[in-house]
C-alpha cells in the first residue's frame, strides 16, 4: 500500500531509504520529496538516475564507498533504540514499535530454551525480513551458526526439495499451503491408494491422540484419571506398529517431498488449526507454535520438543511473565479462566514512536503490556489463545463468539480454502467462504456432476447464477460447516453457521485483505463485502 508506506516514511523521520530495485523506487519516488531523505540505496546493480535530487547509490557503488572508509563502531547500549517496526495491524494507521538492542538480544538469548539447532544447520526463510518474528528468528539462527537461505512464494516448494532445510520459521497460512499441496497430490492417486492412505491416517490419528493422553499432553484431557491414561498408553502401544508401518509406506514419502530433513517448523503470527497440528504430528514433523507480538520483539511463549502441548502456544520463555486479567476490571483471574492477556518482560518495547497516549494505553505503570488477545493458562502454565478482544462477535442474544477457533475448524474441510465469520448483532453466525475449486471439481466428478465455475473476476451475478449456487454444492457446504463446527472441542449451539456466501477472490496481501503475516484484515473484508453480508442476514 503506497499510502501506508508514505505514512511510515514520514512518521519514522527516516533520512535514508533502502529499496529492493529501481522498479520499486519508481513506485514510491513521487512522495519521497515530502520526506527529508538524504540518501537512497538500491539493493540491485541497476544504474540510478544521476540527476535525482536525492543522492542515490546502487549496491556496487555502496560497497565501493564502504571500501574507501574504515569502520567506525558506534557506542550503543542495550537501552538504545535498535529499530522501529511498524505494526501491520488489521485496523487503523500503523504504529512504530520502538525496540531496543536489549529487546532483540533477549530474544537471541531466550530462544535457546525453545530450539537447539546445530552449527551448520540450514534454515529456509520466506517471511518478510523486516517483520519482528522473522527478524528475531534470523538473529537467533545466525547466532547459532546456521545457514539462512531466502526464498519466495514462487520458488518455495522447489527450494524446499533442493536445499533440504532442517528448520523453518513460518505462519499458519504457509503450513496450510503445504498441507493443501500434499492433499491435492493424495487426491490425484488411484482409489485403492487413497483408501490405503486414509487407513493409515485414521490409525495414526488415533495413535497420536492416545499418546497425548498417556503423556498428559492433551489440551482436552488435563483431568484424565490414571485409569484413562493407562488405557490410552495401552492403545498407543497397540497402534504404534501400524503407525510405524504408515511412516515407512506413506509419511516418509511426504517428508521426502519436503526435503526429507526437517527437524522443526516454528509457527507464529496466528493460531494453528487443529487439523494442521494433527497432520504434521502424524507425518513426524514437529511444529513448535509460539506466541508474541511486534511490541514484544516478538516471542513471549513457545512450545518445545519436550513440552509440545498441541492447541496451546506454550509456556513463557525465560524472564517472561504472563497475567490473565478481567478485560473490564483488570483484576487477575484464576488459572483456567479466560481473560485479557498481559505480558511483562525484557522483550517489551519502549513504546510507540511519537505516540505517548497510545503507549500509555498499551503499557501500564507496572510495565504490563496489553496484548489485546484473549486467553487462559493451563495447569502446566501453557498459554492458550482464544482470539482477539476486538474480533469478538456479539450475537443479539448477548453470546460472545471468538471467530478464530471456529474458522480454524471449518478450514479443515477440503472444500474451504479461506473463510471469515460475520454476525455482529445478528441472530446467528454467517460466513464469507473462499472455496477450493480444485477439490470441488474432484468431488463433482465423484458425484457424476459436471461443474463449471466462473473466473475470479466475474461479476457477482454470474457467480450467484453459476454451479456454485446450485443445490448440490450449497448442500455440500452446509454439511461441511455443520460437521466441522459440531466436531470442534467446546462446541456450543451458538457456534452454528446459519448463512454463508461464496466469494472467488482469495484474501491476500495484494488486495489489501491480509496483513504481511497473512492475517485477515476483518474490518477491510467487512467493508468490502458489507452489502453481501447485509443480504446474507436479510434473506
PLM segments and residue spans:
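Conserved C-terminal "lid"/linker of ANL adenylate-forming enzymes
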Residues: 418-422, 443, 448, 478-539
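Active-site loops of AMP-binding adenylate-forming
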Residues: 101, 281-285, 293-311, 326-328, ...
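Conserved AMP-binding/adenylation subdomain of ANL enzymes
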Residues: 105-125, 129-251
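Structural core segment of the AMP-binding/adenylate-forming
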Residues: 1-61
Amino acid at each position: 500500500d503506497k499510502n501506508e508506506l508514505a505514512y511510515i516514511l514520514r512518521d519514522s523521520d527516516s533520512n535514508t531509504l533502502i529499496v529492493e530495485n529501481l522498479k520499486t523506487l519508481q513506485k514510491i519516488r513521487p512522495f519521497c520529496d515530502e520526506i527529508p531523505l538524504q540518501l537512497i540505496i538500491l539493493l540491485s546493480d541497476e544504474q540510478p538516475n544521476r540527476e535525482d535530487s536525492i543522492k542515490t547509490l546502487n549496491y556496487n557503488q555502496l560497497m565501493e564507498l564502504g571500501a574507501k572508509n574504515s569502520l567506525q563502531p558506534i557506542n550503543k547500549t542495550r537501552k538504545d533504540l535498535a529499530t522501529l517496526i511498524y505494526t501491520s495491524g488489521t485496523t487503523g494507521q500503523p504504529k512504530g514499535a520502538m525496540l531496543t538492542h536489549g529487546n532483540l538480544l533477549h530474544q537471541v538469548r531466550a530462544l535457546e530454551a525453545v530450539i537447539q539447532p546445530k552449527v551448520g544447520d540450514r534454515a529456509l526463510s520466506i517471511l518478510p525480513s523486516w517483520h519482528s518474528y522473522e527478524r528475531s528468528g534470523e538473529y537467533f539462527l545466525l547466532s547459532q551458526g546456521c545457514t539462512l537461505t531466502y526464498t519466495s512464494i514462487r520458488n518455495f516448494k522447489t527450494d524446499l526439495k533442493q536445499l533440504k532445510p532442517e528448520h523453518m520459521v513460518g505462519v499458519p497460512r504457509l503450513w496450510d499451503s503445504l498441507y493443501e499441496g500434499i492433499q491435492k497430490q493424495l487426491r490425484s492417486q488411484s482409489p485403492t491408494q487413497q483408501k490405503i492412505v486414509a487407513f493409515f491416517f485414521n490409525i495414526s490419528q488415533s495413535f497420536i491422540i492416545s499418546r497425548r493422553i498417556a503423556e498428559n499432553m492433551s489440551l482436552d484431557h488435563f483431568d484424565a484419571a490414571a485409569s484413562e491414561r493407562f488405557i490410552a498408553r495401552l492403545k498407543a502401544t497397540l497402534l504404534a506398529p501400524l503407525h510405524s508401518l504408515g511412516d515407512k509406506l506413506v509419511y516418509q514419502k511426504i517428508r521426502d517431498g519436503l526435503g526429507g530433513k526437517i527437524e522443526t517448523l516454528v509457527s507464529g503470527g496466528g493460531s494453528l488449526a487443529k487439523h494442521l497440528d494433527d497432520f504434521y504430528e502424524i507425518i513426524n514433523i514437529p511444529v513448535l507454535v509460539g506466541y508474541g507480538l511486534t511490541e514484544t520483539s516478538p516471542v513471549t511463549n513457545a512450545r518445545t520438543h519436550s513440552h509440545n502441548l498441541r492447541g496451546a502456544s506454550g509456556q513463557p520463555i525465560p524472564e517472561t511473565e504472563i497475567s490473565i486479567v478481567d478485560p473490564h476490571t483488570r483484576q487477575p483471574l484464576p488459572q483456567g479462566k479466560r481473560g485479557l492477556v498481559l505480558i511483562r518482560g525484557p522483550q517489551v518495547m519502549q513504546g510507540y514512536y511519537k505516540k505517548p497516549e497510545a503507549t500509555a494505553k498499551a503499557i501500564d505503570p507496572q510495565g504490563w503490556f496489553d496484548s489485546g488477545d484473549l486467553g487462559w493458562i493451563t495447569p502446566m502454565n501453557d498459554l492458550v489463545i482464544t482470539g482477539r478482544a476486538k474480533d469478538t462477535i456479539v450475537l443479539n442474544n448477548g453470546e460472545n463468539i471468538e471467530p478464530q477457533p471456529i474458522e480454524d475448524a471449518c478450514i479443515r474441510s477440503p472444500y474451504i480454502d479461506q473463510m471469515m465469520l460475520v454476525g455482529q448483532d445478528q441472530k446467528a453466525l454467517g460466513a464469507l467462504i473462499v472455496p477450493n475449486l480444485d477439490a470441488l471439481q474432484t468431488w463433482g466428478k465423484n458425484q457424476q456432476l459436471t461443474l463449471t465455475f466462473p473466473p475470479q473476476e466475474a461479476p457477482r451475478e454470474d457467480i450467484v447464477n453459476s454451479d456454485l449456487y446450485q443445490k448440490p454444492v450449497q448442500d455440500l457446504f452446509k454439511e461441511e460447516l455443520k460437521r466441522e463446527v459440531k466436531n470442534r472441542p467446546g462446541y456450543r449451539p451458538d457456534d452454528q453457521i446459519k448463512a454463508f456466501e461464496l466469494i472467488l477472490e482469495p484474501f491476500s496481501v495484494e488486495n489489501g485483505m491480509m496483513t504481511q503475516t497473512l492475517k485477515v484484515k476483518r474490518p477491510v473484508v467487512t467493508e468490502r463485502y458489507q452489502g453481501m453480508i447485509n443480504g446474507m442476514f436479510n434473506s
